[in-house]
Amino acid sequence: DASFHSWG
């Protein structure tokens, strides 16, 4: 889970 990245 890459909730640090920023997609969407």
From Swiss-Prot:
Q: What biological-process GO terms show up in the record?
A: neuropeptide signaling pathway
State where the protein is found. Secreted
Q: What's in the keyword line of the UniProt record? A: Amidation, Neuropeptide, Secreted
Coiled-coil ranges (or none): none
Q: Name one GO cellular component term.
A: extracellular region
Glycine amide: residues carrying this PTM: G8
Q: What does this protein do?
A: This cephalomyotropic peptide stimulates contractile activity of cockroach protodeum (hindgut).
Principal cellular location given in the protein's record: secreted
Origin organism is Rhyparobia maderae
Q: What is this protein called?
A: Leucokinin-4
